[in-house]
């Protein structure tokens, strides 16, 4: 009992300062970024950007108004995407293709900051996500039953007073800040607890064959699991801590792990949100996993000989 109690206390002492530091870092990014996006949306700038890119979406079997959804997704989160898709009421096939693309390309500013801190190039990883999003759209347009309806929708968001827009932003960001503070600290405490009692190896060992298939080093296993369960923003504390402790080398994080999780992450909460629109869950998951695996192997095959590729060994 004393060993367990001591382990819990030690885990809390080690995780609390790191959890607070990471949570504050995320919050400092989240508040100004979300406010800027609110201003862009209110001013019509997001819609203007979408209007320029809209015509290209027909090649993915999507109406031009899809650009509004994807651009919104890149700057905001999946909750905003669900809100816009609800307003547009797209045909089911087109909605599912677009939703899966948004599951790849969303929250660019905040999530890119996380991946940059763990060793990736901000520009490079965003290009990977955009390419991955397009690849997912192409795949689904080819294999999903049905075809483009040809129905064009018009995006006419309801105009509200500016003070109401600010209030809506404040309400939303307050909830987000609270979730960041709570989840980041809980996750980091659980990680420290698992390290204290040697439980992380119990997670890594059974997943080792899967990690090899995906082209990922075994040392990335725990961060990969966290990113797939809670996403990049909330899981950032784990990834950053693993990086600082040397369990994730720069090659692991930047060249391999981030290439995968930038395309395929948060496989629980985010896809489930789209069930409210009647979308089928499996279409929202497997295309991202396949494209993410392809992205990692492509990266491994195209790395120059001067860049060391980590072997599948456990980093103690």
Language-model features, listed with the residues they occupy:
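Alpha-helical membrane segments and immediately flanking helix-loop junctions
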Residues: 63-120, 214-274
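Transmembrane helix-loop-helix hairpins in multi-pass inner-membrane proteins
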Residues: 105-160, 268-269, 274-306
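Alpha-helical membrane-embedding segments
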Residues: 12, 79-101, 127-139, 159-166, ...
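Hydrophobic alpha-helical transmembrane segments
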Residues: 27-28, 38-48, 67-81, 95-99, 119-130, 171, ...
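Juxtamembrane/interfacial segments around transmembrane helices
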Residues: 73-86, 121-128, 149-157, 178-185, ...
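Selected transmembrane alpha-helices and immediately adjacent juxtamembrane segments
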Residues: 1-56, 130-211, 290, 306-316
């Amino acid at each position: 009992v004393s060993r367990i109690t001591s382990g819990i206390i030690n885990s809390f002492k080690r995780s609390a300062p790191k959890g607070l530091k990471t949570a504050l870092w995320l919050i400092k990014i989240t508040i100004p970024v979300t406010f800027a996006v609110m201003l862009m949306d209110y001013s019509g700038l997001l819609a203007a950007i979408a209007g320029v890119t809209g015509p290209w979406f027909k090649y993915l079997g999507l109406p031009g108004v899809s650009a509004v959804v994807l651009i919104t997704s890149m700057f905001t989160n999946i909750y905003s995407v669900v809100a816009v898709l609800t307003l547009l009421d797209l045909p089911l096939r087109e909605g599912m293709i677009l939703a899966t693309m948004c599951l790849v390309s969303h929250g660019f500013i905040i999530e890119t900051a996380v991946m940059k801190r763990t060793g990736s190039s901000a520009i490079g990883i965003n290009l990977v996500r955009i390419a991955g999003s397009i690849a997912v759209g192409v795949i689904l347009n080819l294999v999903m039953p049905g075809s483009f309806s040809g129905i064009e929708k018009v995006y006419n968001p309801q105009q509200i007073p500016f003070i109401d827009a600010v209030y809506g932003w404040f309400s939303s960001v307050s909830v987000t800040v609270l979730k960041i503070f709570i989840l980041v600290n809980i996750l980091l405490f659980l990680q420290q607890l698992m390290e204290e009692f040697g439980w992380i190896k119990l997670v890594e060992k059974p997943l080792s064959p899967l990690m090899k298939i995906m082209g990922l080093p075994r040392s990335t296993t725990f961060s990969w699991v966290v990113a797939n369960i809670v996403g990049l923003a909330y899981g950032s504390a784990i990834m950053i801590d693993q990086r600082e402790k040397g369990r994730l080398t720069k090659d692991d994080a930047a060249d391999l792990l981030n290439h995968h999780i930038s395309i395929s992450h948060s496989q629980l909460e985010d896809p489930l949100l789209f069930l409210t629109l009647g979308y089928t869950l499996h279409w929202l998951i497997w295309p991202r996993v396949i494209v993410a695996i392809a992205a990692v192997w492509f990266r491994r095959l195209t790395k120059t000989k001067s860049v060391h590729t980590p072997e599948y060994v456990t980093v103690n």
